[in-house]
């Protein structure tokens, strides 16, 4: 993938860029793997906003992705197409299995149309193949990693992300996360070899607020420019600093987003670097 820059023909085009979609080989998705997707605008079943800054955006259809890949062991599949997916930053690959079934997977870096991939403990160590962690050698770069055996891929699924398998000891494997955190995961969990493709996506300059609205992202308004009724930082004559430590609209201090007593915390060998004091 490469980035194509626009000429400054208007203020919105100045500095803006877009993917050239050179890796994409088909524009229409596989009809049998598409499901309707209804936008909720960040509202729950009661109509109340539970996630701010969401709403609008272009209509999308959901592509069903196979995140488990545990029921096709030993069955080879050919990469029929690399496709764009509006629901994620990575591209997706359409696989045609020898038994006639079709499935989507996240497209890793280097996977191209016509390649053959497979799943199972005896699969080769090459991009796109899916194996249990116990069958992957130490030092291998992987993505789409499960947290629980059979639970489906949860880690390293976005464009350009990857995890390094540092080693295995007993029934656990040590993984270095994209954040720098080192975490232990059951060796029965599956992972896909290689890093996620479309890494240049992070370098796109969106150019104007309207392109964010097309993606369903609404403006994020600072609390200090609101009225006192709307935010703890609101009000004051002229510009103010807010007058207190940063808090959410509901008065909770910023940061501290992790649950302190989460059961899986005992599997963290080394925490990510945050620039903050841990245990605040």
UniProtKB/Swiss-Prot annotation:
Gene3D superfamilies cross-referenced by the UniProt entry: 2.30.30.30, Nucleic acid-binding proteins, Ribosomal protein L2, domain 3
Assembly behavior: Part of the 50S ribosomal subunit. Forms a bridge to the 30S subunit in the 70S ribosome.
Region annotation (Disordered) ranges: 1-58, 226-280
Function recorded in the entry: One of the primary rRNA binding proteins. Required for association of the 30S and 50S subunits to form the 70S ribosome, for tRNA binding and peptide bond formation. It has been suggested to have peptidyltransferase activity; this is somewhat controversial. Makes several contacts with the 16S rRNA in the 70S ribosome.
Family recorded in the similarity comment: Belongs to the universal ribosomal protein uL2 family.
Molecular function terms, GO-annotated: rRNA binding; structural constituent of ribosome; transferase activity
One Gene Ontology biological process: cytoplasmic translation
Residue ranges, compositional bias (Basic residues): 37-58, 268-280
Record-annotated membrane-spanning stretches: none
Species classification: Bacteria, Bacillati, Actinomycetota, Actinomycetes, Mycobacteriales
Keywords: Ribonucleoprotein, Ribosomal protein, RNA-binding, rRNA-binding
Cellular component aspect of the GO annotation: large ribosomal subunit
Organism: Mycobacterium avium (strain 104)
InterPro entries: NA-bd_OB-fold, Rib_uL2_dom2, Ribosomal_uL2, Ribosomal_uL2_bac/org-type, Ribosomal_uL2_C, Ribosomal_uL2_CS, Ribosomal_uL2_dom3, Ribosomal_uL2_RNA-bd_dom
Keyword Cell membrane tagged: no
Name of this protein: Large ribosomal subunit protein uL2
